[in-house]
Design a protein with these regions (language model features):
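Alpha-helix exit/C-cap motif
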Residues: 56-81
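Aliphatic-rich helix starts adjacent to a transmembrane/signal segment
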Residues: 34-55, 65
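Alpha-helical hydrophobic helix detector
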Residues: 18-34
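Short, conserved catalytic or interaction motifs in soluble domains
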Residues: 3, 29, 44
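Short, surface-exposed interaction loops/tails
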Residues: 144-210
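Surface-exposed intrinsically disordered loops and tails
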Residues: 76-163, 206
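N-terminal leader/signal peptides at the extreme start of proteins
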Residues: 1-12
Length: 210
């Protein structure tokens, strides 16, 4: 006679399920904030590295332009900004205005012989962004061309296009970059040579006036 084997396997009881779910909830409450913080730090570090590459490209373009056309810097260096509470005058300023215009039309005649346009054109080349169709960055995605004193969301919007960025470069009459703002994906990087680079969620770009 065949005996029925006793099946000792059984599912979780309601109490056991509640205990398991409680443990999962506790672990999630501990791990999710840490994971979110890690992701945010990784994003910020990646943007800082991008901004550093942009600073290198900008300084290279600046040095080349100054070596060839030093006289072109005189008229272009008419702007002011404030860094760490200190007002700095007689600076050149390159923004999305020039970058976007040249990205759209490389033969744009506005301020054609100024240092800002010469530098902007070279910066676009170094950043692989001279042609909109294959550009790494897009500078003409908004009609709001004034980059100074703006948060990332104010300038780019809360849902910016993937390649849309804010770029603001300040430089001296002798071709030295003194500050850069780089806005992307809701963050604002401020890079000032000799100081710690910052990356702030919806941070604000440096102010400026002429």
């Amino acid at each position: 006679m065949n005996r029925k084997r006793k099946n000792n396997k059984h599912g979780f009881t309601l109490v056991e399920l509640i205990v398991v779910l409680t443990i999962i909830a506790v672990l999630a409450s501990l791990l999710i904030p840490s994971l979110t913080e890690y992701i945010n730090k990784a994003k910020k570090q990646a943007l800082i590295e991008e901004a550093t590459d942009i600073w290198k490209a900008s300084q290279t373009a600046m040095s080349e332009c100054y070596a060839l056309y030093p006289e072109s810097f005189d008229d272009s260096c008419k702007f002011t900004t404030t860094i760490n509470g200190k007002k700095i005058s007689n600076l050149g300023r390159i923004t999305n205005g020039a970058l976007g215009a040249l990205q759209t039309n490389p033969n744009d005649p506005v301020e054609a012989n100024t240092s800002s346009r010469k530098i902007a054109q070279q910066v676009l080349i170094y950043l692989d962004s001279a042609k909109p169709s294959s550009a790494r960055y897009l500078f003409n995605t908004t009609s709001n061309w004034a980059t100074w004193g703006k948060t990332a969301d104010e300038f780019l919007g809360k849902n910016p296009k993937p390649k849309a960025v804010l770029l603001q470069i300040f430089h001296t009459k002798d071709g030295k970059v003194v500050a850069i703002n780089f806005g992307k994906n809701g963050y604002m990087v401020t890079l000032i040579p000799g100081q710690e680079t910052t990356c702030v969620r919806n941070g604000k770009s440096l102010p400026s006036s002429s």
